[in-house]
C-alpha cells in the first residue's frame, strides 16, 4: 500500500512540476492566442506585419523563455529563473521548432545545477566578494549550459517533438484520439488534470496552432461536458444533499470552470467513472469528427473561456458547443442509469465524502481518524492560513475567499491566501488547508505546519470549526451549537413563513448556491415561498416574524443582532445541509 501511495505522490509531483511551469504563464498563452486569432491570415483582422513581427516571435521566443524562467524560479527563486531563461534560450536558438519541451528541461535543470553550486561555494566566499562570485557564477554556468542546449538539447528535443507530432497526427487520422479519455477522465479525478492539460496538451497544442491555426488538444481535458452531465443526473435522479447541492455546483463548474467541484460526486459512486469516461469519449469523438479546436488553452475550463478561445466564425463556435453538449448528454445518460439502478437509502453527499475519505486513508496505509481539528489551531500558534491545491488557483482560491470572509467577520488578524503545493514554504505558525487527495504531498512539503484536509473546498462546516478554534471556542462548544441549532430549527414552521433570505457578507457565492439549492427543494415539493439573498448590512429590512433568515454558525450573532424578530436557521454550510429537507418534511406533517 505504501509503495502505491508513494508512486502516486511521485506521479503527482512530476505532473505538478510540469504544470507549474505553464500555469503561471497561461495569461501569456491567452494573449498570444488572441493575437493569433486576430492577426494571422485567416484571423478576424489579418495583418501581415503583426503576424510576422508579433505572433511568430512571441511563439518562438517569449513563451518558451517564460516557461524556462518559471521552471528555474520554482527550483532556485530569482537566480534559478535567470539561469533557466539563459539555458532555455540556447535550446530555442538551436532548433527551428517551438521549444516548450526544451525549456521545460533546461529551466529546472540549470536552476538545480546552480543551486547545488551555491550550496557548496557560498558558505566559503570571503566577505566582500559575494556579489562578484554570485554574478560570475551565474553568468559562466549559464553560458556553458546555453551552449550545451544549443548543440545538444535543442536538436534532440526538436527530433523528439517531430516524432511526437507525427504520432499525434497518426492517432488523429485513424480516429483513435477519443481513446485518450480512458486515461484523461480518471486522471482528472485523481488531481492530475493540470499536469495533463498544461504539461502535455498545451505544448503540443500550441505547435498545432502555429501550423493550422487551431488544436483539438486544448479541448481534451478542458471539456466541461462530462462533469456537467453527471451533475445534471444528480439534480434529476439523486437523493438528499447530493441532489440539492448539484444545482449550485453546475453553475460553478460550467460557467466558473472549476472542475474540481464535481469530483466528490464521482468519487461517492465509483461507477460514475464510467459516466465521465463515456462523456469524454463522446465529446472528443464529436470534436474530431466536426474539426473542432481552440486557438489557445482554455483556462479555467469554463464554457466562457472555451468560447473565447474558439476560432473565427459561427461554425467553429458551434462545433465546439456540439462536442461539449454531446459529452454532457452521454455522461448524463450513463450517470442516470447508475443513479436509477441504485437502491441504497443513504445517498448523503456528506456521508459519502466521509466514507471516501476513510477509504482513501486506508488505501494509503494511514490510520482512519476522527474529523476533529488539530489542538494547535489557536491564535497563538497560527499566524497565517494557506489553501493549497495542485495549481494554486481555481478551487483553492474559492476556499480561501470563503474562509477569509469568515476570518474577517470573526475579527481575527490572520492572513488567508492560496498557493500551489509546490510553492509552499515549511514555516511554523501556518495552517495548511488542502484536499484529502493531496494531503500527503502537502504534509511532506511542510512538516512543521498544521494541516487540515477537506474533501471539498466548499465544505464550509470545517471552516466554522477552524474559526471556533481560533476564537478559543472548544470543538465541543461548536458541536453543542450545532445541536442547539437543530433543536431550534425543529420549531420553525414553514407554514408561518412568507419569505426565506440567505444572509451573506462580502462574498455572495455560497449564499447564492444555497438559494438555488433551497429553491430546487421547494420546487420539488411544490412550496411557493420566495427565496432571496441579502447582505448583513441590509438584514434589518427583514426584521419580521414571518421571515426566515438562513446563516452559518460563525455569523449567527450578527444575524440575530441585525434582525432580532426574524426566525433564524443556523446551518454548518449554506450549500449542502440536511436542514433544508427537514424543514420541508415538517411542513407536510
From Swiss-Prot:
Record topology, Extracellular segments: 48-51, 159-167, 296-317
Coiled coil location: none
Record's bilayer topology term: Multi-pass membrane protein
Domain PTS EIIC type-2: 14-347
Catalytic activity of the protein: D-mannitol(out) + N(pros)-phospho-L-histidyl-[protein] = D-mannitol 1-phosphate(in) + L-histidyl-[protein]
Compartments, record wording: Cell membrane
Topology Cytoplasmic: residue spans: 1-25, 74-136, 189-275, 340-589
InterPro entries given in the database record: PTS_EIIB-like_sf, PTS_EIIB_2, PTS_EIIB_2/3, PTS_EIIB_mannitol, PTS_EIIC, PTS_EIIC_2, PTS_IIC_mtl, Sugar_PTS
GO MF, one annotated term: kinase activity
Annotated active site: 389
Official protein name in the record: PTS system mannitol-specific EIICB component
Amino acid at each position: 500500500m505504501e509503495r502505491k501511495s508513494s508512486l502516486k505522490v511521485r506521479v503527482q509531483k512530476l505532473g505538478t512540476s510540469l504544470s507549474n511551469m505553464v500555469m503561471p504563464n497561461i495569461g501569456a498563452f491567452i494573449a498570444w492566442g488572441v493575437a493569433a486569432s486576430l492577426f494571422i491570415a485567416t484571423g478576424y483582422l489579418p495583418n501581415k506585419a503583426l503576424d510576422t513581427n508579433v505572433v511568430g516571435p512571441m511563439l518562438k521566443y517569449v513563451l518558451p523563455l517564460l516557461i524556462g524562467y518559471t521552471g528555474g524560479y520554482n527550483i532556485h527563486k530569482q537566480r534559478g529563473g535567470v539561469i533557466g531563461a539563459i539555458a532555455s534560450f540556447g535550446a530555442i536558438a538551436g532548433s527551428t521548432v517551438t521549444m516548450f519541451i526544451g525549456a521545460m528541461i533546461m529551466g529546472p535543470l540549470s536552476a538545480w545545477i546552480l543551486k547545488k553550486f551555491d550550496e557548496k561555494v557560498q558558505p566559503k566566499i570571503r566577505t566582500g566578494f559575494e556579489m562578484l562570485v554570485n554574478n560570475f557564477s551565474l553568468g559562466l554556468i549559464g553560458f556553458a549550459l546555453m551552449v550545451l542546449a544549443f548543440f545538444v538539447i535543442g536538436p534532440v528535443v526538436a527530433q523528439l517533438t517531430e516524432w511526437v507530432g507525427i504520432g499525434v497526427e497518426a492517432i488523429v487520422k485513424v480516429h483513435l484520439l477519443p481513446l485518450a479519455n480512458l486515461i484523461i477522465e480518471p486522471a482528472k479525478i485523481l488531481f492530475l488534470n493540470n499536469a495533463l492539460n498544461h504539461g502535455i496538451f498545451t505544448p503540443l497544442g500550441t505547435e498545432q496552432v502555429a501550423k493550422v491555426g487551431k488544436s483539438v488538444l486544448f479541448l481534451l481535458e478542458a471539456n466541461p461536458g462530462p462533469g456537467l452531465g453527471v451533475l445534471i443526473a444528480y439534480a434529476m435522479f439523486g437523493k438528499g444533499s447530493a441532489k440539492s447541492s448539484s444545482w449550485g455546483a453546475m453553475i460553478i463548474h460550467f460557467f466558473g470552470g472549476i472542475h474540481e467541484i464535481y469530483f466528490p460526486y464521482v468519487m461517492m459512486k465509483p461507477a460514475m467513472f464510467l459516466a465521465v469516461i463515456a462523456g469524454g469519449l463522446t465529446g472528443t469523438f464529436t470534436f474530431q469528427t466536426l474539426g473542432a479546436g481552440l486557438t489557445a488553452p482554455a483556462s479555467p475550463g469554463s464554457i466562457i473561456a472555451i468560447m473565447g478561445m474558439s476560432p473565427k466564425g459561427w461554425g467553429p463556435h458551434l462545433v465546439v458547443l456540439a462536442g461539449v453538449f454531446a459529452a454532457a448528454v452521454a455522461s448524463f445518460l450513463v450517470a442516470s442509469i447508475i443513479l436509477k439502478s441504485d437502491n441504497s437509502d443513504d445517498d448523503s453527499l456528506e456521508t459519502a465524502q466521509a466514507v471516501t475519505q476513510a477509504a482513501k486513508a486506508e488505501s494509503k496505509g494511514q490510520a482512519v481518524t476522527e474529523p476533529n481539528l488539530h489542538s494547535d489551531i489557536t491564535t497563538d500558534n497560527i499566524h497565517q492560513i494557506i489553501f493549497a491545491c495542485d495549481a494554486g488557483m481555481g478551487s483553492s482560491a474559492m476556499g480561501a475567499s470563503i474562509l477569509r470572509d469568515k476570518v474577517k467577520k470573526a475579527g481575527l488578524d490572520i492572513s488567508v491566501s492560496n498557493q500551489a503545493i509546490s510553492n509552499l514554504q515549511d514555516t511554523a505558525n501556518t495552517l495548511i488547508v488542502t484536499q484529502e487527495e493531496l494531503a500527503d504531498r502537502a504534509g511532506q512539503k511542510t512538516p512543521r505546519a498544521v494541516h487540515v484536509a477537506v474533501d471539498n473546498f466548499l465544505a464550509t462546516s470545517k471552516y466554522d470549526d477552524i474559526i471556533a478554534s481560533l476564537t478559543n471556542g472548544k470543538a465541543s462548544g461548536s458541536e453543542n451549537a450545532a445541536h442547539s441549532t437543530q433543536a431550534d430549527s425543529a420549531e420553525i414552521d414553514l407554514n408561518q413563513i412568507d419569505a426565506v433570505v440567505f444572509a451573506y457578507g462580502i462574498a455572495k457565492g455560497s449564499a447564492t448556491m444555497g438559494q438555488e439549492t433551497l429553491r430546487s427543494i421547494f420546487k420539488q415539493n411544490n412550496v411557493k415561498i420566495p427565496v432571496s439573498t441579502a447582505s448583513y448590512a441590509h438584514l434589518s429590512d427583514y426584521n419580521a416574524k414571518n421571515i426566515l433568515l438562513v446563516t452559518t454558525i460563525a455569523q449567527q450573532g450578527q444575524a440575530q443582532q441585525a434582525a432580532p424578530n426574524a426566525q433564524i436557521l443556523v446551518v454548518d454550510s449554506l450549500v449542502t445541509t440536511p436542514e433544508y429537507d427537514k424543514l420541508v418534511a415538517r411542513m407536510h406533517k
